[in-house]
């Protein structure tokens, strides 16, 4: 399998899922967009696209002009080529915008280890049918996808009290996942070094919030790693058919 990974900051990669892909011998091509990497002109060689999180937001095209091209290439991969896509956090929001939604500020920001509740359509979904009806996942976002109701090719799979579109899919090959289960033991401390992430965390919980958040994440790490393993296994068998 050949995978193209769109990254917006080096420390936000597919994490635990990346380790699983490497163990399976998959060929990974990482495009570090914030560092000036360009998306290849020809996407035909890639079986899968991952689109990860980042400290910028989808509307920041003037500050980050590469976002314009990124959205075009996601549209090409998902809508035109109809190839498998997984988008996490910012990647989820980029997919949402590409398929006709709007990305708006969350009220309030969603930060912490929080509940995600699956909906009825989860039971017949290829990726998430074996997940429990409620899971704990790491949230660290201040924007979210809205206004996808009129797109009949969108299925809403999971929500939280703050964010309606925690998981949605376009047709049956492209998924937006607003939360994080792909994290590892070092993730929270690594992300806490990013000024935008740290300020959002401390604005909500005060000074010293990072240490508490890290401890809470590690207490839930085994479960999130298990969910990542299930997601990856189902992605291989049900979406890629391997």
Give the label of every model feature segment.
Residues 1-4:
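Extreme N-terminal starter segment of soluble prokaryotic enzymes
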Residues 6-8, 33, 90:
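Cofactor-binding loop segments of dinucleotide-utilizing enzymes, especially the Rossmann-like FAD-
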Residues 7-9, 51-55, 142, 179:
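Glycine-rich His-Gly loop
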Residues 19-85:
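Flexible gly/pro-rich beta->alpha loop and the following alpha-helix that scaffold active-site loops
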Residues 78-102:
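Catalytic nucleophile loop
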Residues 183-242:
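Acyltransferase
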């Amino acid at each position: 399998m050949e995978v193209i990974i769109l990254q917006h900051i080096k420390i936000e990669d597919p994490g635990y899922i990346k380790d699983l892909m490497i163990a399976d011998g998959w060929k990974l091509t990482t495009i570090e967009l914030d560092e000036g990497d360009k998306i290849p002109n020809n996407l035909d060689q890639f079986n899968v696209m991952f689109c990860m999180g980042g400290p910028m937001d989808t509307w920041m095209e003037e500050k980050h002009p590469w976002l314009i091209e990124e959205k075009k290439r996601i549209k090409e991969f998902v809508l035109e080529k109809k190839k498998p896509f997984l988008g996490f956090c910012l990647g989820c929001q980029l997919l949402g915008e590409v398929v006709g939604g709007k990305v708006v500020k969350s009220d309030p920001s969603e930060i912490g280890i929080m509940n995600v509740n699956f909906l009825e359509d989860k039971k017949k979904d290829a990726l998430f049918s074996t997940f429990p009806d409620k899971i704990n996942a790491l949230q660290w976002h201040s924007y979210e996808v809205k206004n996808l109701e009129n797109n009949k090719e969108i299925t809403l799979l999971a929500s939280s009290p703050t964010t309606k579109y925690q998981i949605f899919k376009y047709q049956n090959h492209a998924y937006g996942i607003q939360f994080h289960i792909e994290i590892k033991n070092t993730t929270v401390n690594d992300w806490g070094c990013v000024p935008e992430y740290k300020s959002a965390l401390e604005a909500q919980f005060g000074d010293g919030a990072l240490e508490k958040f890290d401890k809470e994440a590690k207490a839930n790490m085994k479960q999130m790693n298990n969910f990542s393993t299930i997601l990856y296994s189902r992605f291989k068998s049900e979406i890629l058919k391997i």
